């Protein structure tokens, strides 16, 4: 509110904001793809049991060398219900009589088969090595593949709980730097994990630091930016991760061994860690947390970088006068209880938490299971990211013209419809199913950007990170619950996707329980969220008319 006047004085979108936003966007572009990294590093290739007569070069039982690979496969591996080689069982003894049967007959009694006691043979045409091939996470151990995703999401969940409160107490920049250090170390160490348990433990620690990085980078952009540029920032926030996803798809194509891909994606984070020393702490946060001297120092630094010649005129008296109400409020330390102190803020927290839960179940449910949509995960990820960038380009125009609520309604509804169409399209129409799923995932990033922007605009600065942490608690609950919905596929193959699509459509209409925030100033205190903020918003709308009349 009154901080906006100070921001205008030092430059609301100058050289400082551009450099800081570019850095934080690049940081998002390199961190976010790690959330779905296991689409590549944990890809499940086609596989079958290892059998001596087929895979041991020294074997020559019964003159098998004169038989083709297809014949050897036929007598060694039983067929499943789709007449494809079984992935998890083999014949206990070669079934020579099958060579004389028509290919449509595959009646083999259960006692003639056994599990893959000698291991598996993997199709390495897409990836030379993944954690699945390294630790044999297939057949009876296939559930462990979900454990890797679950461990990362649990880390994300816990990180979301603790990050908000720490950010409001210790500052955006400090928590961001600490989290980035932890993320860089753990994700680099993942590449050298000697066992599955250590791998999951490191992924848990990495997940623990993701939410503090994303939340605080968004807050540092938000709290240094004028409201009229927030829609542009939301679009850029949607584009940045997808540029990262496109790069990760390209790197996955170049580095087919998961250790190398993991290192290539993780080591550059240390470079960004070094650059965080030049980040500026949020002056808005410093002032409203009763640190006006430090806030003034940051404002003067920004004014100097933006080339504002009157930066020396900015004094402590001006800051205290402009932010008098906020400084008075800052004398009392905000607590978690303050989130529910007023009925309006309480309602917003509850609605946003409810929405975020269903939102993340649907978003992550689709994002981390892309391999179910296509065998060529690299190409699919690249196409989805390219589409998401194109969709994000129109984001600012849509947000500026029709606002946050209508944009969110349209995007989430379309996303849910695309998912449901993909579900009910016949299996034979695979191309259409992939197109629908690609469209659904393509608009997901803009949905995330709009959701984060609208959420931050509804919360006061003094409690923003804490509130985002509470909302993130429910959101991250959805993130680790989303893989569990895939267990429903054992009862009905399309059931998980029906839930993902239905949640998206349901979530779209709950946005009308929240107010529109287009062209409105950010609230700085809980007082601004109440009726006084509504009056100030009304006054802001009337100001231009008053000025024109006086002129």
Curated annotation (Swiss-Prot):
CC terms in the record's Gene Ontology section: plasma membrane
Chain residue ranges for the region called Disordered: 523-551
Topological relation to the membrane, as annotated: Multi-pass membrane protein
Transmembrane segments: 16-36, 146-166, 174-194, 204-224, 235-255, 259-279, 349-369, 377-397, 406-426, 433-453, 468-488, 495-515
Keywords linked to the UniProt accession: Cell membrane, Glycoprotein, Membrane, Transmembrane, Transmembrane helix, Transport
Main localisation: membrane
Tissue-by-tissue expression: Expressed in proximal kidney tubules, and in liver hepatocytes (at protein level).
MF terms (GO), sorted A to Z: transmembrane transporter activity
Bias (Basic and acidic residues) ranges: 525-545
Transmembrane recorded as keyword: yes
Subcellular location: Cell membrane
Topology feature Extracellular, residues: 37-145, 195-203, 256-258, 370-376, 427-432, 489-494
PROSITE patterns (alphabetical): MFS
Glycosylated residues (UniProt): 39, 56, 62, 102, 107
Spans within the Cytoplasmic topological domain: 1-15, 167-173, 225-234, 280-348, 398-405, 454-467, 516-551
Family assignment from sequence similarity: Belongs to the major facilitator (TC 2.A.1) superfamily. Organic cation transporter (TC 2.A.1.19) family.
Protein name: Solute carrier family 22 member 27
Record organism: Mus musculus
Organism ancestry: Eukaryota, Metazoa, Chordata, Craniata, Vertebrata
Gene designation per UniProt: Slc22a27
């Amino acid at each position: 509110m009154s901080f906006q006047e100070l921001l205008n004085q030092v430059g609301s979108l100058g050289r400082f904001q551009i450099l800081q936003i570019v850095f934080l966007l690049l940081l998002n572009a390199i961190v976010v793809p790690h959330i779905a990294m296991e689409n590549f590093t944990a890809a499940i290739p086609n596989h079958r049991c290892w059998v001596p007569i087929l895979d041991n070069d020294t074997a020559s039982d019964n003159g098998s060398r004169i038989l083709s690979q297809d014949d050897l496969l036929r007598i060694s591996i039983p067929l499943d219900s789709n007449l494809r080689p079984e992935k998890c069982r083999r014949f206990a003894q070669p079934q020579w009589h099958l060579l004389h049967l028509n290919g449509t007959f595959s009646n083999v009694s259960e006692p003639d088969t056994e599990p893959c006691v000698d291991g598996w043979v993997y199709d390495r045409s897409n990836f030379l090595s993944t954690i699945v091939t390294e630790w044999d996470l297939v057949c009876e151990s296939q559930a462990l593949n979900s454990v890797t995703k679950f461990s990362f999401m649990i880390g994300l969940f816990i990180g979301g709980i603790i990050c908000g409160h720490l950010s409001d107490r210790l500052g955006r920049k400090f928590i961001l730097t600490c989290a980035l250090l932890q993320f860089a170390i753990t994700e680099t160490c993942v590449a050298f994990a000697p066992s599955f348990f250590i791998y999951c433990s490191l992924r848990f620690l990495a997940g623990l630091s993701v939410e503090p990085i994303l939340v605080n980078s968004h807050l540092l952009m938000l709290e240094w930016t004028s409201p009229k540029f927030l829609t542009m920032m939301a679009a850029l926030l949607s584009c940045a991760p997808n540029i990262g996803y496109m790069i990760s798809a390209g790197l996955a194509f170049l580095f087919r061994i998961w250790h190398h891909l993991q290192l290539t994606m993780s080591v550059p984070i240390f470079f960004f860690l070094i650059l965080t020393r030049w980040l500026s702490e949020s002056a808005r946060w410093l002032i409203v947390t009763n640190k006006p001297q430090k806030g003034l120092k940051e404002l003067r630094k920004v004014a100097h970088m933006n080339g504002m010649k009157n930066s020396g005129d900015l004094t402590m008296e001006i800051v205290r006068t402009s932010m008098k109400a906020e400084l008075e409020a800052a004398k009392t330390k905000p607590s978690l209880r303050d989130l529910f102190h007023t009925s309006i803020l309480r309602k917003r927290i509850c609605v946003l938490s409810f929405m975020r839960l269903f939102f993340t179940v649907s978003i992550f449910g689709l994002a981390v299971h892309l391999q179910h949509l296509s065998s060529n995960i690299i190409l699919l990820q690249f196409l989805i990211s390219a589409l998401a960038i194109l969709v994000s380009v129109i984001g600012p125009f849509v947000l500026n013209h029709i606002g946050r609520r209508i944009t969110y309604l349209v995007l989430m509804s379309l996303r849910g419809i695309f998912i449901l169409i993909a579900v009910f399209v016949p299996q034979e129409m695979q191309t259409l199913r992939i197109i629908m799923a690609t469209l659904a995932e393509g608009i997901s990033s803009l949905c995330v950007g709009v959701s984060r922007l609208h959420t931050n605009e509804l919360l006061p600065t003094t409690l923003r990170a804490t509130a985002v942490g509470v909302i993130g608690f429910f959101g991250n609950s959805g993130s680790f619950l989303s893989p569990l919905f895939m267990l429903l596929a054992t009862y009905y193959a399309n059931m998980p996707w029906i839930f993902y699509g239905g949640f998206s459509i349901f979530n779209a209409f709950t946005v009308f329980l929240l107010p529109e925030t287009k062209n409105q100033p950010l609230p700085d205190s809980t007082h601004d969220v109440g009726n006084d903020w509504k009056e100030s918003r009304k006054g802001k709308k009337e100001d231009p008319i008053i000025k024109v009349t006086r002129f």
